[in-house]
From Swiss-Prot:
Domain of life: Bacteria
Protein name: Uncharacterized protein YjiJ
Subcellular location field: Cell membrane
Alphabetical list of Pfam families matching this protein: MFS_4
Cell membrane found in the keyword field: yes
UniProt keywords, alphabetically: Cell membrane, Membrane, Transmembrane, Transmembrane helix
TM stretches of this protein: 13-33, 55-75, 91-111, 113-133, 138-158, 171-191, 209-229, 248-268, 273-293, 298-318, 331-351, 362-382
Assigned GO CC terms: plasma membrane
InterPro entries, sorted: MFS_4, MFS_trans_sf
Topology class, membrane: Multi-pass membrane protein
Annotated SUPFAM superfamilies: MFS general substrate transporter
Length: 392
């Protein structure tokens, strides 16, 4: 029976809200709350810039390890998805709370590594669970938009705390409490087993729009390209001359993610995923470059809107293409490209830490990130040109 007439469609709003909450907690807070917290912890003198960069890389390494671990079939048995998702959500909340102890550097690094594993679990188990209940593109867009909502919520939460002179320790404690409330909401909104739909094989197109390994390289470059800005934007924007803009810039990124997730999936349905991915990567590369104009408030606003509106769109478009490609053997391409993306994310902050300290390191790393995105866009452009030649 077509999914449009399947009873699950009556529950799509509930499922969309559930998916949004999954990534609001798992990614928006679990991963990206660290972005507005980094300048706070640095200003308190708890850690050096280099240490904070390695802590960021540790989180991405944990995410990479979690993506690899949870790609095994043993974790995807229907009876295990719900317990694993709730366990990942509980771990995310507890690990956020653990940051309030302000332990030594090595323990903070370990906490953020484990938080990365938990974030990967929430993304993988949450998205798999949703795909078992609906195939509606609105729900998939809502899932990814949760990242933006979490980013905006987390940044405004930190700003409100700083207004009342709260320490980073108190801010982490409050974030842990907020995570607990989200965990309760997730439990209440969990899709019922009886509404699961029949699994369908991945749709493979006869005309392969690109090789599977080329998509993996492209996505790895995108992971490296975006992560510098996603980690250090509030720190990079301190020279903008507008404290109000500097404070809310990361919120602007988060809010622009939401329409971006819906917009790119709509565009892909109309014009195709590969042309949209090409445009997405080009816009993202330009916006990453524009963040270097940190003394221009207007350019920072434009770059933040464009950056936020594209980087989660990259993920949704790559996942759409990956589901259409043939792969050798039993390779799980969705898991593999996520793995390569994770490697790119680790290398970004690690490179920043190795270059030097402060703004000079950020500028150099940002240029490298923009170059990686331009190369990814070039790969996509070449494949699009080849496809047009073949089909003409």
């Amino acid at each position: 029976m077509p999914s449009s007439t399947h009873p699950v469609e009556r529950f799509s709003f509930s499922t969309a809200l559930f998916g949004m909450l999954v990534l609001t907690l798992g990614m928006g807070l679990g991963r990206f709350l660290y972005t507005p917290m980094l300048p706070v912890m640095m200003a308190e003198g708890s850690f050096s810039f280099s240490q904070l960069s390695w802590i960021a890389s540790g989180n991405y390494a944990g995410y990479l390890a979690g993506s690899l671990l949870f790609s095994f079939g043993a974790f995807h048995q229907p009876s295990r998805l719900r317990p694993f998702l709730l366990a990942s959500a509980l771990a995310s909340g507890l690990l956020i709370l653990a940051m309030a102890w302000l332990p030594p550097f090595i323990l903070v690094l370990l906490i953020r590594v484990l938080a990365g594993v938990a974030s990967a679990g929430m993304l993988i188990f949450g998205s798999t669970l949703i795909m078992q209940h609906t195939r509606h593109p609105f729900v998939l867009a809502a899932l990814f938009s949760g990242v933006g909502i979490g980013i905006a919520l987390g940044n405004e939460y930190v700003l409100a705390g700083l207004h009342f002179d709260l320490s980073s320790q108190t801010l982490w404690q409050g974030a842990g409490a907020l995570s607990g409330m989200m965990l309760i909401a997730l439990t209440l909104l969990m899709p019922s087993k009886k509404h699961a739909i029949t699994p369908m094989p991945l749709a493979k197109t006869e005309q392969q729009i690109m090789s599977w390994w080329l998509l993996a390289i492209l996505y790895g470059l995108a992971g490296f390209g975006y992560i510098i800005v996603a980690t250090y934007l509030p720190l990079m924007a301190k020279d903008a001359g507008s404290p109000l803009l500097t404070a809310h810039l990361w919120t602007l990124v988060g809010l622009s993610i939401v329409p971006g997730c819906f917009g790119w999936l709509w565009a892909a349905k109309r014009w195709g995923a590969l042309p949209c991915l090409t445009a997405n990567l080009l816009v993202q590369a330009i916006c990453v470059l524009l963040t270097l104009a940190s003394d221009s408030p207007l350019l920072l606003i434009i770059s933040s809107l464009g950056f936020g509106g594209t980087f989660m769109g990259t993920t949704s478009l790559v996942m759409t293409i990956a589901r259409q490609l043939s792969v050798p053997g039993n390779l799980n391409l969705l898991g593999f490209v996520t793995l390569i993306y994770g490697i790119g994310q680790i290398l970004g902050p690690a490179l920043t830490s190795m270059l030097s300290n402060g703004t000079s390191a950020l500028a150099s790393a940002t240029l490298c990130g923009a170059a990686a995105l331009f190369i990814a866009a070039l790969i996509s452009t070449v494949q699009l040109f080849k496809l047009q030649v073949v089909t003409s």
